[in-house]
């Protein structure tokens, strides 16, 4: 596939004179392009929904959700994975982000890493990939060899797979069970796929991880009831979540949370059902952690 023929690499006729514009006009132009991203994603929501269901099923069976990409795409996967433990209370290692070239590539490009088709496979082998894991390959261009090799290996093992790219009918899409291809058009700055393409990938990842965690019972109403209260901000958030879910006072919420070691779900259950902390935990275990079912 010729890079120059890709939509993501083509010149944008709306921004041909970007360097001649005033600062405000330049930013307005970029913003006009950014506004196209959500509309492009709306068109591929059925594919995103498929990927969410696959991810949730994999995680329910004890598998992992593994993101893999190079450059901006890889960094976005690492970012989303790193946010899952504090947001949803899942263990580190349940959602994993891999970037071509390893952790050092987060800060500085590792030359040639993305072009190594065997490297993606080796990185997954190092994780001892099994068929219960789901692998999501990310590449704005849709042609990154590192991602192709990884998806091919995952598919051979029988893993559920998804590919996220911003060009239609891309090579990585052909390697995956589910293809998510929001076509956001040429970038405001030609070929700079950290812009619209990066934004599109981030929005899809937001939905993928959040949707899967909702299905795992990590959310009640629209509240992150498995949040880990590991700092002052998150302790405050835990209190506010309990208040929102139960209607009690701040003082009552804090009292309940102290009895549950600041675990939100049992605190809510205690207050709404009038049970002890131990009984609340037992009810949650019986319902596999699903707060709504326990209520």
Swiss-Prot record:
Pathway of action: Amino-sugar metabolism; 1,6-anhydro-N-acetylmuramate degradation; Amino-sugar metabolism; N-acetylmuramate degradation; Cell wall biogenesis; peptidoglycan recycling
Induction: Induced by MurNAc 6-phosphate that releases the repressor MurR from the DNA. Repressed by MurR in the absence of MurNAc 6-phosphate.
GO molecular function terms listed in the Swiss-Prot or TrEMBL record: carbohydrate derivative binding; carbon-oxygen lyase activity; ether hydrolase activity
CDD domains: SIS_Etherase
Record-annotated active site: 83, 114
Reactions this protein catalyses: N-acetyl-D-muramate 6-phosphate + H2O = N-acetyl-D-glucosamine 6-phosphate + (R)-lactate
GO biological process: 1,6-anhydro-N-acetyl-beta-muramic acid catabolic process; amino sugar catabolic process; N-acetylmuramic acid catabolic process; peptidoglycan turnover
Family matches, as InterPro entries: Etherase_MurQ, Glucokinase_regulatory_CS, MURQ/GCKR, SIS_dom, SIS_dom_sf, UBA-like_sf
Misc note: A lyase-type mechanism (elimination/hydration) is suggested for the cleavage of the lactyl ether bond of MurNAc 6-phosphate, with the formation of an alpha,beta-unsaturated aldehyde intermediate with (E)-stereochemistry, followed by the syn addition of water to give product.
Family: Belongs to the GCKR-like family. MurNAc-6-P etherase subfamily.
PANTHER family reported in the protein's UniProt record: GLUCOKINASE REGULATORY PROTEIN, N-ACETYLMURAMIC ACID 6-PHOSPHATE ETHERASE
The protein's role, per its UniProt record: Specifically catalyzes the cleavage of the D-lactyl ether substituent of MurNAc 6-phosphate, producing GlcNAc 6-phosphate and D-lactate. Together with AnmK, is also required for the utilization of anhydro-N-acetylmuramic acid (anhMurNAc) either imported from the medium or derived from its own cell wall murein, and thus plays a role in cell wall recycling.
Protein name, entry field: N-acetylmuramic acid 6-phosphate etherase
Organism: Yersinia pestis
């Amino acid at each position: 596939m010729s890079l120059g023929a890709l939509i993501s690499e083509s010149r944008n006729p709306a921004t041909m004179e970007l360097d001649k514009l005033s600062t405000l006009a330049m930013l307005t132009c970029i913003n006009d392009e950014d506004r196209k991203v959500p509309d492009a994603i709306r068109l591929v929501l059925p594919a995103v929904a498929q990927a969410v269901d696959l991810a949730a099923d994999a995680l329910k069976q004890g598998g992992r959700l593994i993101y893999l990409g190079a450059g901006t795409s890889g960094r976005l996967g690492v970012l989303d994975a790193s946010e899952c433990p504090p947001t949803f209370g899942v263990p580190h290692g349940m959602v994993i982000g891999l970037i071509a070239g390893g952790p050092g590539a987060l800060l500085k490009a590792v030359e040639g890493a993305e072009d190594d088709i065997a490297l993606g496979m080796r990185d997954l082998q190092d994780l001892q990939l099994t068929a219960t894991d789901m692998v999501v390959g990310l590449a704005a261009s849709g042609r990154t060899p590192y991602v192709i090799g990884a998806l091919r290996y995952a598919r051979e093992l029988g893993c559920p797979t998804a590919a996220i790219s911003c060009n239609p009918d891309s090579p990585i899409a052909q390697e995956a069970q589910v293809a998510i291809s929001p076509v956001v058009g040429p970038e405001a700055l030609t070929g700079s796929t950290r812009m619209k393409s990066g934004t599109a990938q981030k929005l899809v990842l937001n939905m993928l991880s959040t949707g899967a965690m909702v299905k795992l019972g990590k959310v009640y109403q629209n509240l992150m009831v498995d949040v880990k209260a590991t700092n002052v901000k998150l302790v405050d958030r835990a209190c506010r979540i309990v208040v929102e879910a139960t209607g009690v006072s701040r003082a009552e919420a804090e009292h309940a949370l102290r009895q549950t070691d600041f675990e939100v779900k049992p605190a809510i259950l205690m207050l709404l059902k009038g049970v002890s902390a131990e009984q609340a935990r037992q009810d949650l275990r019986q319902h596999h952690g699903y707060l709504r079912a326990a209520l």
